[in-house]
Curated annotation (Swiss-Prot):
Protein localization: Secreted
Covalent S-S links between cysteines: C31-C45, C38-C50, C44-C57
Signal peptide coordinates: 1-21
Residues cleaved off as propeptide: 22-29
Protein's organism: Chilobrachys guangxiensis (Chinese earth tiger tarantula)
Tissues where this protein is expressed: Expressed by the venom gland.
CC per GO annotation: extracellular region
Family: Belongs to the neurotoxin 10 (Hwtx-1) family. 32 (Jztx-16) subfamily.
Main location: secreted
Annotated InterPro entries: Huwentoxin-1, Huwentoxin_CS1
Organism classification: Eukaryota, Metazoa, Ecdysozoa, Arthropoda, Chelicerata
Protein name listed in UniProt: U11-theraphotoxin-Cg1a
Protein purpose: Probable ion channel inhibitor.
UniProt keyword terms in alphabetical order: Disulfide bond, Ion channel impairing toxin, Knottin, Secreted, Signal, Toxin
MF (Gene Ontology): ion channel inhibitor activity; toxin activity
Length: 65
């Protein structure tokens, strides 16, 4: 009986953690991912920049702009 209650509480905690992680992921969907057309850096997700030549969201150059 005690084990069953403990497993139910553990399951509910796991569901709560997964739903919170899903909500955080939804907030980031407004940004554009890798090789998607962009006009400025703010449109791209945090790990990308808007490339100056082709205007795609790409990884930033290690050598600067």
């Amino acid at each position: 009986m005690k084990t069953t209650i403990l497993l139910v509480i553990l399951g509910l905690t796991l569901l709560f953690a997964l739903s919170a992680a899903t909500e955080l992921k939804d907030e980031e969907r407004d940004c554009k991912g890798f090789q998607v057309k962009c006009k400025k850096d703010s449109e791209c997700c945090s790990s990308y920049v808007c490339g100056s030549q082709w205007k795609w969201c790409v990884y930033p150059s290690p050598f600067g702009r």
